[in-house]
From Swiss-Prot:
Domain CheW-like: 14-155
Gene3D superfamilies assigned: CheA-289, Domain 4, SH3 Domains
Name of the featured protein: Protein FrzA
Pfam family, one: CheW
Species assigned in the record: Myxococcus xanthus
PANTHER family per the UniProt record, alphabetical: CHEMOTAXIS PROTEIN CHEW, CHEMOTAXIS SENSOR HISTIDINE KINASE-RELATED
Length: 160
């Protein structure tokens, strides 16, 4: 990298996000919250759990709860098909699988390009870190506060 480019990159801090699509939503979570991506296999439904918990699956000898972000955010319902993926997300001691229709990959986003979340009381807005606006052929990405999302999901599941 040329010295001028290196200085410009240092002057503009970036954050890396794991980006994916579920339903009509294009979402990103901080890459440090993602352990790995798996094919969505068979899920075992659990009785008397919130509707956003699709079930559990076995992963590396552990039972992994699988979350439907569309239901959690009141934006519809995810479907599991042959191309569906799960990403294993973690924050603190909480680990969960999350349904993704399409994995878009890792994206480095300049911190200055992250806009604050929109004001509003819906479930999606309260779990956002911010939004990256559309540019060129890139669509807007809603950046999730994954730590808050998993904590809220756990609280809702335990409260039932």
């Amino acid at each position: 990298m040329a010295p001028d480019r290196a200085l410009a990159a240092q002057a503009r801090p970036e954050q890396e996000f794991f980006c994916f699509r579920v339903g009509d939503l294009r979402l990103g979570v901080p890459s440090e919250n993602v352990l790995e991506v798996l094919r969505a296999g068979l899920l075992t439904p659990l009785p008397r759990t919130p509707s956003f918990i699709m079930g559990v699956t076995g992963h590396r000898g552990e039972v992994l709860p699988v979350l439907d972000l569309l239901r959690f955010l009141s934006k519809g319902e995810a479907r599991i098909g042959p191309r569906t993926r799960l990403f294993v997300g973690v924050t603190g001691s909480y680990v969960a699988g999350v349904v993704a229709d399409t994995v878009l990959g890792l994206r480095r986003i300049p911190v200055a390009d992250i806009l604050p979340p929109p004001l509003g009381g819906d479930a999606a807005a309260e779990h956002l870190l911010g939004v990256v606006q559309a540019s060129g052929n890139q669509e807007a990405i809603n950046l999730l506060n994954f730590s808050k999302l998993l904590q809220t999901a756990r609280q809702r599941a335990v409260a039932r």
